[in-house]
Amino acid sequence: MKDKRKIQQLKLEQNQKKLRSQKQDLKQNKGKSKKDRSGLLDLIFRKEPKRYTVEDTIPYLRLLKSGICQIDEKHFNKSIAFEDINYQLALEEDRDLIFNQFANFLNSFDPSISIEFSYINQLGRNEEMKSAIQIPDKKDGFDDIRLEFREMLKSQIVKGNNGLKKSKYVTFTVEADNLEQATSKLERLEIDILSSLKSMGVRAESLNGEERLKVLHDVLNPNKTFEFSYKNLKKKESTKTYIAPDEFNFTPSRYFKFGKFIGAASHFQILASELSDRMLAEFLDIDDNINISFHIKAIEQSEAIKMVKRKNTDIDKMKIEENKKAVRSGYDMDILPSDLITYGEDVKSLLKDLQTRDERMFVVTIIFMNFAKTIQKLDNTISQISSIANKHNCKLKRLDHSQEQGLISVLPLGVNKIEIDRGLTSSSTAVFMPFTTEELFINSANSLYYGLNALSHNLIMADRKRLKNPNGLILGTPGSGKSFSAKREMANAILTTDDDVIICDPEGEYGNLVRQFKGEVIKVSSKSKDYLNPLDINMNYGDGDAPLKDKANFIMSMLELVVGGSGLTAEEKSVIDRCLPKIYEKYFENPKPCNMPILQNLYDMLKNQEEKVGKKLATEMEIYVTGSLNVFNHQSNVDLNKQLLCFDIKELGSQLKKIGMLVIQDQVWNKVSQNRGNKATRYYIDEFHLLLKDEQTASYSVEIWKRFRKWGGIPTGITQNVKDLLMSKEIENIFDNTDFVLMLNQASGDREILARKLKISQPQLKYVTNSNAGEGLLFFGNTIVPFLDKFPKDTILYQKMTTKPEEVR
């Protein structure tokens, strides 16, 4: 502020000198007319606007709660924040489509509208990321692991982009006589812009006043927390008070000071005849503080064509002059300077584009602003940007003596104070593609960690409960990290949420993790003393309206496996349906565990039926009731109320495997019914392809995939045998009801099948081709993100999750 006062004092002294000089001139011109003297007096005493405070640098009159900003008496604007989409990894035809859609989006703005695209990268501004990794303690005996998990997430952020926050905004400005007229124009424009972005698959939302002020505050105060509410705004108080830094000092010609930071504004000069659509992405990939603004204004089409025609005429004149020179000098008049020929061809091509190819002309100004705490650090970043610019045959030129104007022009306020522009067509402007790779970061209490984005190195945090179909698949070759990824999600869910987690474990490899979290490992085999009753039911079973009816469907599926062949006849189904209400009668009258029927009760009831088919069914059931496979003819004696349950079926044997897996699925359905409306139930099925091989288990699995989500169930199939999985008749139903796929390294044949099935592009496919463990593609709804996860090996969780014997300590 002292510097400001000194500057003001200096200006005052200069004005006083000018005044004395003007008075002297007045004395010397006494003979002039009154009119002349009056004009001179007006000149002397005319008041020039002066900047007295830091707020005067911020170029707006008022920013309303609605998000409308009034720049001056005639100009008003709004801002929209938009997210990234997959462009760099998309299929070639999809990239072309996105490019054309973006060019058409630019074409939709007429000359009365000014557009500013703002791209803001800021270090240390990712509050969302910080809050997402704050897993609260629960005092359940696992808080030491929660602490370890939080530290792991912090270390992953450091390995990645160090908490760099990347934001994208489009600010659109209109001219209007008053606020009412401006509001009407801006609202119509806002709807059109949101609709255009949505058609490109871009998530976008309009910013209200508070959100716009926060964006401005964070640019102008990189190390401060934004604290503002329109409720606390005093009458006649400006919102600028809450976003202005402590000071601005624009005295140096090449830098400026704001608060504790040093900034530098530069103009981006395009020298190349052709540009790459990767260039903007390369600038935004720099892990440092960068602000880039594109000010774009359309030129009236007829005026643009006239302008190009004039250029063409000028070139023709130059050619005639060159011809005359050639004749005078005695050489061939058809030989023209190569630059003139090239320039002429370019102008003709441009004219053709404007007249026949739906191209439009835009006036574009590109401003960069960087800041740091030291000049050395600032210069290093600017040097990085300059290197990229030079690589693309462009230049970054410092705005000497115009740093204040540069800063104003880079703020997302739609104000451009730099009168250096370049004429570009729609296609040339669209080359500055704002899209690179889609991020996946959902700030939710239920969000889980899935690694780092392989392109941007941003943390991937996602909540499957937000998906339309949270059902999932984890696919990968042996050694790709398939089981580890599943275990990491299970552990994360237990640490972060109250969800129940159930595992169907055909290889006995999840026991360590289950015991770490004091869960229950239930060994299901003919030798085991852990018993599951396939006739277990609760009052919420199935849809809850008719639990016995839903249970009957399961029992018939199980008996179809028992009888084999073509399954149950209509007569057999009728007999079973008649018996079931009778064996459950005692339980429904007094729902105690001891009154729950077992297979023996159904066996006895069938044996006593008059029809021969009843006795036939009883005979076919006999081995499972009184014979050697009677493991399922007992009351359940295991604790099914633990948060983490694991059904270990490694020793189940081939004769019992199908029935065993069906019984487990029914126990899971029981759990989902019981938890309905209270908490989610996550069900992980390893070697999932085995369930889809048999008609009954496949049919029951599809029912789970279709109906679980309604009651808070989240099933996940895990397999390494993609070919077997895709051979199932039911795979279409599985894929149609799956919005989450975690795909790790794939064998070549499987890779090709999945590429066709999931429409994976060649650039995306490389992330599942000979990739390292823990690397692959994550499909989350319509989002596809390449990921990598290097989980720290020196952690308790890693020891419990790894399947490599040499790593277990």
Please place each PLM-identified region on the residue numbering.
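Hydrophobic anchor at the beta1->P-loop junction of P-loop NTPases
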Residues: I474
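Conserved lysine of the Walker
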Residues: K482
